[in-house]
Amino acid sequence: MKITLTIVGYLLSALLMFAQKSGAYPAQDKLDFRYSPPEWQTAICLPDDPHKSLVDRSGELLYHYGQGGREFGTRISVRVKDAAVWVKQELHSPRVPIVRTYRRAEGLEITEEAFANTAIQPVKTPGAIVKRTDDGGILRNWAKPAATLDPSLRDIVVHMGGDIEYEVAVPKGSSRRIALALCEGYWNEAGKRIQVLSVEGTEKKTVDLVAEIGQNKAAAFWFDGRDTNSDGRISVQVDAAPNGSDKNTILSGLWVFALETKPDSEALLSGKLTSLSLADLHQAISDGPVRSDIILVSVKNTAAGERTFQPTLIVNTTLPLTFQPDQQRALIDNHEVVTASLKMKALKGEIETQRYIELESIKVPAGQTVRFFVQYYNGAASQAGSLNGPPNVGQALQCRERAVEFWEKKSKLPFDRVQLPDPGIQALMESSVRNIWQAREIKNGLPAFQVGPTCYRGLWIVDGAFLLESAAMLGAGDQARNGVAYELTVQKPDGRIESLTNDFWKENGIVLWTCVRHAQLTQDKVWLESVWPKLQLIAEYIKTLRRQTLLNNSPLDDGLNPAGTLDGGIGGTHDEYTNTLWNLTGLKSFIQAAHWLGKTDEAAKWQKEYDNFMLAFQKAVKRDMLKDLGGNTYLPALMGEDGTKQLPQRAQWAFCQAVYPGQIFSKEDALVAGMMAMLEATEREGMVYGTGWDATGIWNYFASFYAHAWLWQGNGFKAAQSLYAFGNHASPTLVWREEQSLKGANFRKVGDMPHNWASAEFIRLTIHLLALDRGNDLHLFEGLPTEWTHAGMITRLNGIATPFGALTMELKIAADGRSASLHVEPLSDPSCKNIIVHLDGWTKTSGEKVMKLDPRKDNEVKIPIR
């Protein structure tokens, strides 16, 4: 067995081992956000809202993600006093995303409350010929076409990871000549962005933008579209082709002409035909609802005398901005509107993209508070006057109260499925639920769960597996099903699942597991039978992958999976283990499902394949096992010599998931023991360090992968510690960034925020610490934190979905703290043999570590504690 590390790995590991021996991190027994990132952003949008409005740590409203060559193309804020100092930021409550930012200046206390106006209604726009129906955005000055071409070709509409969709209104059954333009401003090599252009009633056109057009060169494509289904609309769509590596779609121009207009691409691209068009891209409206967001500012005078101040509205945007004092508004990109309750007096300054609009001065008597607000509309400027936004401060206050009422009483989110005695963990649970529904959208009339509001605004196969599981656990399995069905839409004719890249082989195993777990949690064998032929094809493709390894030039992958993409810390294509681990997991889940459906012969057939697959894996493990500097044995994520060049902990996400939910190892497996010891040796701030994309940072929700592995191995105490460490890396507004730096280090961030795979993992881990299915038994309290067992505390699960039906149970600690009463309602599925209550670590027991309950009975038991 080799003992090897790179020089950097050696130094890092030595430092980490010393830190651990020196007691580098405190016990994680309370939630206090001690490792919160130094910057964050919080969603204030509504559930299923296509308008993903965010607020950052400073209180700025954030819009137009990715536009103008920066993270957010537009930022809107208010300055009351130049010398005001930021104090803190918090939410109205975990359920109510009103973000409160507190500042202090000499003699002044300033509170800014940012929230979405929940009462605003969509405004109908009659007569619009072109309507955009996807949820993508716009990027300005993205390409650099020739100066002789129409300047509008510099801009694109874009959909990150999705399709661009438009509708052209026509008399039913009629036709129009439609021109589309493309101009690639980013890639300079072929094969990157390949798009499929579709116009209803015509043949599709596939275009490799660089190979066929060139970088920063424009081309036009003409289609004679027809309303084939007589619904009064011609659909226009731009899809990413399967063989292109960049799945972000773009469109530089769209024009609608009468059929008699002669196609002339040169004239079109130079702008000479625009005046002849019936409509074009820039006249299109969005199909999304009109929204408004409010910053309500309260200024309290704590001084002895009257104070006068003059606020400033700051609009920082890369988009065109027009200040219209006669109409008392600022206009962004000719259609978005910013207004204020105070008079907008003058544009008093401009620094690059920042414009400073002077508002009228306000006098504040001693000891009194005055309020004003600014408001952002995402709707058309011509409609702003008809929107039912607040015209005065009194109505703005009413808007705030309506927002509170909406989130607390009308949002219908599954907040009440889990009740915990730790208010901090409860707060993160409720915020996680809310954020998952805020990131979600309605697409084609169905709910689509998404990872985040910005760079991860979409559903990926692996992220989606756990997002959809968490939704089903909370009783929203019917809503999650659309996401599960979506994962099957990327299946190819040969059975493979292909979404992220064409060698991300693990997507096959992930989809198998996702479908089986979803069917179990929703207790729906009929649905599982309906998709079974698709799952059979996936299993066959995993078998095909294994055969390919015996025919290629690499001896490292024999009997496993061909070289593929890892993700989660290591980029590129390699001989590696993450694909193998997940495809073993998927096959095991598929076999379990076959037994569940009574397909015993099929289960036996695939068990032989699985056993052979596992033998090949175990053989490779013996070849590639290494030791870290602490003597812990581990399997690197990369095979062969490449594995010696990475930090031991790098990209070990799939290993943890193979432990649980994969369950492909026995509890006694020496590989698991060594791997968990290796990962534990890297801990900083209670978290595994350097496993993600940032080798010197923390992948926040890896804490759940890690904790679930400990829990499955029987160490519930360690899993509970990880829950608190996970929570302490959230921001004070109860959200996570995907990855962040250690406290005090130069801050680097990776990924989206709020990141809702993190939200899903916090939900999954919290519930599984309390209730976890193992085979035909349901185990309770394997990871119950001892902090939740003090006098008077109540822990309750209310209708949580399990493979045995909905679980409702309550653990109530007596007022004197000496005993607990446990109530567990009957489970509906007869396949559950036992409910096993774990007593070790939190009860006064005489050698008994578990208690068995009958799952078919309504159980009421009293448990001595102290």
How should each PLM-predicted stretch be described?
Residues 91-104, 414-453, 659, 673-676:
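Conserved oxyanion/phosphate-binding beta-strand-loop segments in alpha/beta enzyme cores
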Residues 446-459, 497-500:
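Internal amphipathic alpha-helical repeat/solenoid segments
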Residues 335, 412-437, 461, 504-506, ...:
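Active-site acid/base region of carbohydrate-active enzymes
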Residues 288, 292, 353-396, 494-506, ...:
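The feature captures the catalytic groove of carbohydrate-active enzymes
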